[in-house]
């Protein structure tokens, strides 16, 4: 019985663990040319209900296969842009530069010693892969729904990788938002890079250059749009660099490389993580082992334990044993007497008078 309860408890915890694993199975790995992106989900949804309408997508960057950097440290730039479906342009939101990032196994952009970031105007979106935040937005509005681009470039390559994340925003149940399109638009990466243009030119400001995408989009910059400024977030770092860090990113991408980039980097290779299948296999193995142990223990011969006797039971058994011994001794004595009085081969019942 104890084994049965133990097995039931184990099964209950395994079911909870399996459900948690199924929930996490939505994780996806996007493989780029020089760096890969692991996200818990390719899209996130938020329901507007109060003052705290924050949205975030957690994940981290990885080095897979031949993507490992050749040096012990490297610098990297990450830009966050929003696909504006109204004006058909790419709206720059946030830019962060990491310096002196150590090469730590498969982890990318981890424990970087230098960080410099800029916000675009009053944008509330940001990305901070150093703390496993791929996308974060505060005070989300219905108009913020859509597709966001993460452009990542390492300092030892002239090309870059582009990753896409989507945000769904569901408004409150009222009539004021009925005409608002709060679902992300359906655009392919190649269509975005071929059709969309940069909404605003990136100003040169304290080590900043124009957007990495500025070199690759086919359309010219919208010069009629007001050139808004960047706001400095944090310049420098909490630690002193061990060597001179140049935050400027030298980009040598030209229009001739656009076609190659479209074929290799825009349509990233997606790998589904088979967490659910692994959990089911582990669960099946544990069930088989548990059932085998239960059957083996059930087939073993159980020990028979006599219950403890009370004093009254012991005295009664002793008295009955004494009476039986007396009767047995009397019968033996009677048998010996009969054998002496009668011939050896005579048949006489010793218990008759």
Swiss-Prot record:
<keyword id="KW-1040">Host Golgi apparatus</keyword>
<feature type="topological domain" description="Intravirion">
    <location>
        <begin position="294"/>
        <end position="353"/>
    </location>
</feature>
<dbReference type="GO" id="GO:0016020">
    <property type="term" value="C:membrane"/>
</dbReference>
<feature type="glycosylation site" description="N-linked (GlcNAc...) asparagine; by host">
    <location>
        <position position="122"/>
    </location>
</feature>
<keyword id="KW-1031">Host cell junction</keyword>
<keyword id="KW-1133">Transmembrane helix</keyword>
<dbReference type="GO" id="GO:0043657">
    <property type="term" value="C:host cell"/>
</dbReference>
<keyword id="KW-0946">Virion</keyword>
<feature type="glycosylation site" description="N-linked (GlcNAc...) asparagine; by host">
    <location>
        <position position="227"/>
    </location>
</feature>
<comment type="subunit">
    <text>Interacts with gE.</text>
</comment>
<dbReference type="GO" id="GO:0044156">
    <property type="term" value="C:host cell junction"/>
</dbReference>
<protein>
    <recommendedName>
        <fullName>Envelope glycoprotein I</fullName>
    </recommendedName>
</protein>
<keyword id="KW-0325">Glycoprotein</keyword>
<comment type="function">
    <text>In epithelial cells, the heterodimer gE/gI is required for the cell-to-cell spread of the virus, by sorting nascent virions to cell junctions. Once the virus reaches the cell junctions, virus particles can spread to adjacent cells extremely rapidly through interactions with cellular receptors that accumulate at these junctions. Implicated in basolateral spread in polarized cells. In neuronal cells, gE/gI is essential for the anterograde spread of the infection throughout the host nervous system.</text>
</comment>
<feature type="glycosylation site" description="N-linked (GlcNAc...) asparagine; by host">
    <location>
        <position position="75"/>
    </location>
</feature>
<keyword id="KW-0261">Viral envelope protein</keyword>
<dbReference type="GO" id="GO:0044178">
    <property type="term" value="C:host cell Golgi membrane"/>
</dbReference>
<dbReference type="InterPro" id="IPR002874">
    <property type="entry name" value="Herpes_gI"/>
</dbReference>
<dbReference type="GO" id="GO:0019031">
    <property type="term" value="C:viral envelope"/>
</dbReference>
<keyword id="KW-0732">Signal</keyword>
<feature type="topological domain" description="Virion surface">
    <location>
        <begin position="21"/>
        <end position="274"/>
    </location>
</feature>
<keyword id="KW-0472">Membrane</keyword>
<feature type="transmembrane region" description="Helical">
    <location>
        <begin position="275"/>
        <end position="293"/>
    </location>
</feature>
<feature type="glycosylation site" description="N-linked (GlcNAc...) asparagine; by host">
    <location>
        <position position="84"/>
    </location>
</feature>
<keyword id="KW-1043">Host membrane</keyword>
<keyword id="KW-0597">Phosphoprotein</keyword>
<feature type="glycosylation site" description="N-linked (GlcNAc...) asparagine; by host">
    <location>
        <position position="138"/>
    </location>
</feature>
<comment type="similarity">
    <text>Belongs to the alphaherpesvirinae glycoprotein I family.</text>
</comment>
<dbReference type="GO" id="GO:0055036">
    <property type="term" value="C:virion membrane"/>
</dbReference>
<feature type="compositionally biased region" description="Basic and acidic residues">
    <location>
        <begin position="310"/>
        <end position="324"/>
    </location>
</feature>
<dbReference type="Pfam" id="PF01688">
    <property type="entry name" value="Herpes_gI"/>
</dbReference>
<feature type="region of interest" description="Disordered">
    <location>
        <begin position="303"/>
        <end position="324"/>
    </location>
</feature>
<feature type="glycosylation site" description="N-linked (GlcNAc...) asparagine; by host">
    <location>
        <position position="40"/>
    </location>
</feature>
<feature type="glycosylation site" description="N-linked (GlcNAc...) asparagine; by host">
    <location>
        <position position="252"/>
    </location>
</feature>
<keyword id="KW-0812">Transmembrane</keyword>
<feature type="signal peptide">
    <location>
        <begin position="1"/>
        <end position="20"/>
    </location>
</feature>
<keyword id="KW-1032">Host cell membrane</keyword>
């Amino acid at each position: 019985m104890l084994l049965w309860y133990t097995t039931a408890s184990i099964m209950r915890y395994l079911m909870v663990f399996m459900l948690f694993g199924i929930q996490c199975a939505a994780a996806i790995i996007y493989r780029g040319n020089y760096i890969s992106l692991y996200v818990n989900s390719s899209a996130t949804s938020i329901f507007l209900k109060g003052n705290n309408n924050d949205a975030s997508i957690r994940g981290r960057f990885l080095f897979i296969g031949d993507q490992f950097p050749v040096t012990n440290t490297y610098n990297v730039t990450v830009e966050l842009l929003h696909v504006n479906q109204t004006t058909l342009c790419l709206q720059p939101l946030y830019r962060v530069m990491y310096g002196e990032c150590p090469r730590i196994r498969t982890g990318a952009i981890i424990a970087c010693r230098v960080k410099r970031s800029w916000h675009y105007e009053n944008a509330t979106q940001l990305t901070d892969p150093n703390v496993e935040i791929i996308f974060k937005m505060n005070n989300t509005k219905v108009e913020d729904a859509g597709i966001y681009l993460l452009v990542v470039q390492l300092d030892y390559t002239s090309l870059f990788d582009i990753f896409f994340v989507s945000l769904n925003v569901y408004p409150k149940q009222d009539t004021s938002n009925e005409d608002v399109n709060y679902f992300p638009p359906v655009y392919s990466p190649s269509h975005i890079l071929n059709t969309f243009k940069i909404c605003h030119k990136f100003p040169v400001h304290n080590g900043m250059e124009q957007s990495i995408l500025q070199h690759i989009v086919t359309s010219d910059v919208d010069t009629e749009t007001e050139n808004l400024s960047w706001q400095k977030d944090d310049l420098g770092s909490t630690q002193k660099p061990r060597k001179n860090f140049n935050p400027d990113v030298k980009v040598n991408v030209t229009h001739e490389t656009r076609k190659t980039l479209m074929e290799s980097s825009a349509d990233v290779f997606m790998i589904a993580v088979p967490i659910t299948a692994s959990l089911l296999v582990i669960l099946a193995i544990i069930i088989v082992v548990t059932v085998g142990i239960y059957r083996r223990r059930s087939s073993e011969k159980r020990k028979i334990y006599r219950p403890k006797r009370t004093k009254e039971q012991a005295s009664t058994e002793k008295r009955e044993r004494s009476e039986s011994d007396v009767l047995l001794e009397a019968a033996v004595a009677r048998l010996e007497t009969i054998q002496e009085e009668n011939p050896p081969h005579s048949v006489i019942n010793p218990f008759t008078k």
